[in-house]
C-alpha cells in the first residue's frame, strides 16, 4: 500500500472517530432532564415576575409547580419537527407549555400559554388520555367522542362532523395527569438556582 493511501486512510479514520465523538456529545447535550435543570428556572422567572403579562394570575415563586410527561402532537401537515412539548402544571392547572426545540448540536427553549388552555379544559372535564392534533395554528383534543378546538386562545367544543380529518391508527395519545417526577425535581432545582442569582 502506498504512503499516500495510508495517509488518506488515517485521515478518514480520524474524521470518522471525531464525528462519532461529536454525535455522542450532541446526543448527551440534548437530555431533556438536563435541559430543564439548566434552563427552566430562568425561563419561568420572567413569567413569575410578571404573570399578568402572560395571562396568569395568583402565581408566584411559592406556587406549586409540576411537570407532566411530554405531549404527543399529531401534526396533520406531517411536519414532525424536533420539538418536545411539556405541560407545566401550576397550582393544579395546566397553565403553560415548556417547549424544547432541538437542533443539530444545540437547543432552544420557550415557555408560554400555547395550547395549555386546551389541555387544561380537557383535564378539567375529566378527559385525561387525549389525542392532541395540530392543524397549522389550530389545536384539537379528542377523548371519548368529546372534541375541543383551540384557535388562538379561544376554546370551543365541536362535533366530529365539523372536522376535515379523522383519528388515524398511527396517532398517539397523551396523558394529562402523569407527573414526571424527574422533570419536576429538575424544574424545582432550576427555579431555586434562578432565584439565587
Role assignments for model-derived ranges:
Residues 1-41, 197:
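Gram-positive cell-envelope targeting signals
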Residues 7-10, 52, 109:
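Generic detector of intrinsically disordered, low-complexity, polar/charged segments
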Residues 12, 21-24, 32-35, 46, ...:
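Extended aliphatic helical segments
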Residues 28-76, 113-128:
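Short, non-transmembrane alpha-helical segments in secretory-pathway proteins
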Residues 56-103, 144:
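Exposed beta-strand-loop-beta-strand "reactive/processing" segments of non-cytosolic proteins
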Residues 95-140, 145-194:
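A short, surface-exposed interaction/processing loop segment used at functional sites
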Amino acid at each position: 500500500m502506498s504512503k499516500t493511501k495510508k495517509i488518506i486512510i488515517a485521515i478518514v479514520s480520524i474524521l470518522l472517530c471525531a464525528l462519532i465523538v461529536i454525535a455522542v456529545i450532541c446526543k448527551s447535550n440534548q437530555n431533556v432532564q438536563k435541559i430543564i435543570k439548566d434552563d427552566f428556572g430562568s425561563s419561568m422567572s420572567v413569567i413569575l415576575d410578571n404573570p399578568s403579562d402572560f395571562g396568569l394570575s395568583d402565581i408566584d415563586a411559592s406556587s406549586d409547580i409540576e411537570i407532566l410527561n411530554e405531549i404527543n402532537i399529531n401534526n396533520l401537515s406531517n411536519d414532525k419537527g424536533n420539538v418536545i412539548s411539556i405541560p407545566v402544571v401550576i397550582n393544579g392547572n395546566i397553565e403553560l407549555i415548556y417547549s424544547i426545540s432541538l437542533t443539530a448540536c444545540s437547543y432552544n427553549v420557550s415557555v408560554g400559554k400555547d395550547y395549555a388552555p386546551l389541555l387544561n379544559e380537557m383535564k378539567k372535564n375529566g378527559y385525561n388520555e387525549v389525542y392532541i392534533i395540530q392543524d397549522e395554528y389550530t389545536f384539537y383534543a379528542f377523548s371519548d367522542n368529546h372534541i375541543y378546538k383551540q384557535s388562538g386562545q379561544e376554546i370551543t367544543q365541536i362535533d366530529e362532523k365539523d372536522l376535515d380529518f379523522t383519528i388515524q391508527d398511527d396517532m398517539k395519545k397523551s396523558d394529562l395527569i402523569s407527573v414526571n417526577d424527574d422533570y419536576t425535581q429538575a424544574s424545582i432545582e432550576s427555579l431555586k438556582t434562578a432565584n439565587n442569582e
